[in-house]
Amino acid sequence: MSKNGIITKEQFMAELRRWQQGSVSRRHFLGVTGLGAATAVLGAAMPGLRPRRAWAQGDIGNRVVLATWPNYHDPENFELFTDATGAFVQVNVFGSNEEMLAKLQAGGSGWDVFVPTNYTITTYVSEELIEPLDVSKLSNYDAAAFDPRFADAGTVDGVLYAVPKNWGTTGFAVNTAHDGGTALTSWKDFFDRTMDDFSGRTMVHDYQLTTIGNALKYFGYSFNSVDPAELADAERLLIEVKPHLFAISSDYQPAMRSGDAWLTMCWTGDGKQLNTDMPEIAFVLGREGGEIWSDYYAIPKGAPHSDAAYALIDFLLAPKVNAREVLAHGYPVADSRTNALLPPEILEDPILYPAQELLDALEFGAAATLTDPNRAELLARFKSA
């Protein structure tokens, strides 16, 4: 609030987004903003109360709901989309593919667009939770522009269900000011040092694929293993490490930035964002290997605002818009048209584009891991220990 008690448009929008993302209660939102004070800016801020702009595809409604990962978009692009279409982008953030799958299986998610990872798409298809895409509604989609390694998973049995968003790797971020002059280079270092000089300062994902997968790599096993004996080894390690953790969370940037955490499992773009703002934080791919992944835009079955969903995906696929996304979040993109617009320092950045020998050791997630009961039960035991 300002000194005279009147909330500004920027403050109102910030509180509105916190409420829509579930970060605060409706009571908090109403109390902080004050309906009387907010009235002056409601016409510019609330969907349905602002005049709709003309849009080439016609009237798409006043809202579109996007389910996505933390720190994964340029908010200014959403504002530009709203200016162009009149549809407000409501963002729901999730921390794992299991969380996303469970939400869609339960029904009534209210989502229009979601961002699944490559290995999950066949499950969505088999459970009839995802819509085939009508490419005639995606004028900015050009299949030939995408690297097949990061695009092929979107097509199942010859039908296109998802289009590429970004790709990246899973490593760890370490605040080198606290490494005592001895660099961490492996998953063995990650877990061993967590139980030593990084005790109480380490975070792992709230996500079975990566937390279990990286524990498996400690022993030299496959990142995707569902072998009971190998999972038992990973569980013993995780239970041993648990008392030394700062937190189990997929939203680790705040703790790393504040200095509460010094070491965390980390995705490419987060590593780039942290390193850009705090050069003492390094992003490391464990030399044993780990995960390479690709994310996609998709539309869930029964999306309530289907026209707006297509409009948002098409808008975000436009090369100039996509380039702004990359510059904001730091995740590589598989679209050659977008890459042609990016500066060399992005395309040559070793965090975003690691050396080939490091990439060769990485594995794409396997569909079996998403629904394997042993992995799900292992993570539950680890979290409750």
Regions of interest found by a model, annotated:
Residues 1-28, 51-53:
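N-terminal secretory signal peptides
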Residues 24-45:
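N-terminal export leaders
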Residues 55-123:
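Early extracytoplasmic/lumenal segment of secretory-pathway proteins
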Residues 109-113, 131-135, 140-172, 200-202:
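A structural signal for short loop-to-beta-strand junctions that line the ligand-binding cleft
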Residues 119-130, 151, 155-185, 210-219, ...:
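Periplasmic solute-binding protein
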Residues 122, 203-207, 211, 215, ...:
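Ligand-binding pocket segment of bilobal, Venus flytrap-like solute-binding proteins
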Residues 131-142, 162, 279-291, 300-303:
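Short beta-strand->loop
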Residues 295, 300-359:
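Mature extracytoplasmic/periplasmic domains
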